[in-house]
Amino acid sequence: MVRDVGVTEMNRVLRRACAPLLAAIACSLATPVLAQNDKMTPIAIPAQPDAIELGTGPLPGATAPEVWHKQYGSVFARNVTVATLTPFLPDPAKATGAAVIVAPGGGFMTLSMENEGWDVAKALAAKGVAAFVIKYRLRPTPPDMAAFQQSMAQMFAGAARPPAGKPVDMTASLAPQIADARAAFALIRRRAAEWHVDPDRIGMVGFSAGAGLTMATTLKGEDAKPAFIGIIYGSLAPVTVPADAPPLFVALAADDPLFGNSGYGLIDSWRAAKRPAEFHLFEQGGHGFGMYPKETTSTGWFDEFVRWISMHGMLKRLH
C-alpha cells in the first residue's frame, strides 16, 4: 500500500524536486510562450460525465475547492483533491487492445487537461488505442487567481536544481499521485474485457510533471507495471532502473527552457540497464508543446510515439 505523506511535507519536498517546473510555470504567467492568450481566465468546472472516481480518497489536509481556468487556448484544473479517470475508447471495430493512461502536466499545481490530456486521448482513440486521462490529486493552491500566482512565485524562490549527473528520487513526495496512478491501472485491468483492453498492454504517457509521475509510477508503482512508457518533455535526470523496466519513449525539444540543457542521464540509465529506449530530440518546440499546432517538428512526437508502440507489438488486434 502506498502511504500518503502529509501536505506540509509534500510541499517541502516538491519545492526542491520540482523547482525547475515551478519556475517555468511562474515565468509563463508573465511571458507569453505561445501565440494563444496567456491570460488566466477563470471558468466553470466543465462537465465530465464519463469521469470515474479512483477511490484513493480526498487529499489529506486539502480544503481549497477545485477550480478551473483557461490559458494558452487550453483549460487547466487546480486544487484537484479527488482523483478521476476518464476513458476515451476507440470504435470497437478499430480497437487494438492497447491502452494508454495519459498524465497531463502542470507542476503538480495545475493540470493541462486539454492540450496534454483530452486532445492526446482523442488522438490515441482514433488510432485504435483505448486512452484514459488521469486527473490526479494536486498540491493545494489558493483559489484566488492573484494569490495563486503569488504563491507560485514564493514556491520556487530560492529552490535549487538537483546536482547534475546524480540519480534523483522525487518519488517520496508523490505518494498520493502514485497511489492515483496505481488505482488507474487496477481499474483498467478490472474492466479490461468491458473496454476491449489487453491487461498486458497498458502503458502510460506523461507530459512535464505528468512525465515525472509516469516515471515515479514505473519506479515505485509496485503493481502498476506499465507495459511501456512515454516521457514527453519531462526530466531526463538519471535514475536507478529496475531489471524489468518497460520500453521507454522520450521526446524533448532542444530549446526546452527546463530540461533542454540538463543532459540525458535518463537515456543513459536505461541503456546501461540494457532496457529498450527511443529518444527524439527536436531542434525547436520549447516546453509544453503537447498537441498544440506549431511550426516546429516537435509536433511529430505523437506519430512517432504511435509508430513506436506499434513496433513493440502493442497494436496487434485482440481478435
Segments predicted by a language model, with ranges:
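Acidic catalytic loop of the alpha/beta-hydrolase fold
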Residues: D255-G260
